[in-house]
Amino acid sequence: MSSIRPFTKNDIPQVVNLFQKVFFNNGQTAPSSSNLSAYFEETFFHSPWTEDGTEEEIRSLVYETGDGAIVGFIGIIPRRMLLHGRPIRTATSMHFMVEPGSRSTLAGVQLLKTFFSGPQDLSLTDSAGALGRKIWEGLGGATALAYSINWVRLLRPSRYVLRLLARKNMLLRLFAALLRPLCPIIDAMASCALPHRFGKPVASLQSKDLDQETLLAGIAQFPSSYALRPDYDPGSLFWLLAKADQLARPGELRKVALHNADGEMVGWYLYELSADGMGEVLQIVGRRKSFGEVLDHLFYHGWKNGAIALSGRLDPKFAQEFSDKYCFFNCGGPWTLTHSRNPEILQAIYQGDMFLTRLEGEWLMRRKNE
C-alpha cells in the first residue's frame, strides 16, 4: 500500500535517481549522483532552519509504494517571516516531482495535500511550472501574479538579440556569430537614436562592497515597511550568501552597497553576471525616494562590467520605477504560488506588500542543479 512519509537521509539515493529521471529526461547531462546526494543532504538536513531543531514538524515528503519504491517527492524548507512584526511559520517547497509512470496514481496531488495540511502559516514556492501551478490552484492555493513578473533591462541590445537567436538552433547560431562583430556599431547607433533607453547608464550614488554585517543591518531596517517580510539572523543570512557564492564562478557575484552624498546608506543590490553577459539580480533594495538612483547604479555597474542585460523579479512596490527606467516586463512563468488559511497573510500578498527576492525562495536552492 502506498503512503506519504517524511524524507530521511536513507531516501537520498532514490530521490536523486528520481530527480535525474524527471528533470534530465531529454538528453541533458545531469549532475553526478554524488554531487546531487551532497546537495540534497545539505539543503534538506543541514540548512540553518532544519539544524536548529525548532521546525521538526515541517519536513520534506516522499511518496512510497508498497514495495518501498519512492515515486514522488516534494522538498520543503522551513523559513521564518514576520507579519506586521509578528513571527509566522513559512514553508518553501521545491523539486516537486513524480515519476512519469506513476502520475496516474495522483501521487503529486496527495503530496501537495499533505504539504498544505502542515503546521505552517504560509506555503510558498517561486519556481513552479505550468503543471505544478495547475495542481496547486486545484487544491486551494493561488498564483501570486504580482510576484511572478520578471523585468529585463537591455544594456547592449544587439548582443542580447543575437544571444536569443543563438539559442534557437544551429543555423541561427552561425548567423549570430557572423553578425557579432557588428554589435558595437549597432549598439552605438541605438544609443544615439534612443539615448534614454540604450545610452550609457549614469550613476549618482557612491558604492562600496557590501559585506555581511552591512547586509544584515540593512535587511533588518529597509524592508520594515512591508507587511510580510523575511526574518533573518546572522546564521541563516550568511548561509544563504555562502551558497550564492558557491554557485557563482569566481567574480560572478557582485554585492554593492550604495550611499548618498551625505554618506547615508540608501540601498544595495546583489547580482550574478554569467559568462555570456546576462546578469541575474538576486536582490535589489532601496529607499522609496532613492530607488530610481539605485536602479541607475545597478545598470551602470552592469554595463561597466560588460553585461548585455540585467533581469530579476519585480517588486510590485516599485513597478513604476522599473518602468520609468525602460525595463521590459514578462509574466509567463516560473510562477510564484502561495497557500494560507490566514486572510491577513493573503491580503499582504495580494496587495503587493510582501518582501520577496531570490534569496527567499527556491531559485537560489535549485540553481546548482540546472
Regions found by a protein language model. Give the residues of each.
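Amide-forming acyltransferase catalytic core, primarily the GNAT-like/NAT-type
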Residues: P13-G75, M81, I88, A142-A275
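"Short basic amphipathic alpha-helical interaction patches in structured regions
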Residues: I77, P87-T92, A107-L112
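Active-site/acyl-donor-binding loops of N-acyltransferases
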Residues: R59, L122-A188, K243-D245, L253-R254, ...
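Conserved acetyl-CoA-binding loop-helix of GNAT-fold acetyltransferases
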Residues: H95-S117, K289-H301
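Short acidic, glycine/Ser/Thr-rich loop/turn "cap" segments at secondary-structure junctions
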Residues: R59, T92-P100, G118-L124
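Conserved acetyl-CoA binding element of GNAT-fold acetyltransferases
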Residues: P87-P100, G277-R287
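Acidic/polar helix N-cap motif
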Residues: T8-D11, E99
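Extreme N-terminal starter segment of soluble prokaryotic enzymes
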Residues: S2-I4
